[in-house]
UniProtKB/Swiss-Prot annotation:
Taxonomic source organism: Lactuca sativa (Garden lettuce)
Name the UniProt record assigns to this protein: Large ribosomal subunit protein bL32c
UniProt KW keywords: Chloroplast, Plastid, Ribonucleoprotein, Ribosomal protein
Main location: plastid
One biological process term in Gene Ontology: translation
Localization per Swiss-Prot or TrEMBL: Plastid, Chloroplast
Length: 54
């Protein structure tokens, strides 16, 4: 079983955690942006079928 030899420093742990959080932040921002463009009809990457309500 692999066991780390030394304890990870607090600063290194904080750096890794911030990188992980930043990735999630950008993914959420892109998803929100895509949702906004789909709702306004400005999306260039998705084709949304329009339903006629009459």
């Amino acid at each position: 079983m692999a066991v780390p030899k030394k304890r990870t420093s607090i600063s290194k742990k904080r750096i890794r955690k911030n990188i992980w959080k930043r990735k999630g932040y950008w993914a959420a921002l892109k998803a929100l942006s895509l949702g906004k463009s789909l709702s306004t009809g400005n999306s260039k990457s998705f084709f949304v079928r329009q339903t006629n309500k009459s």
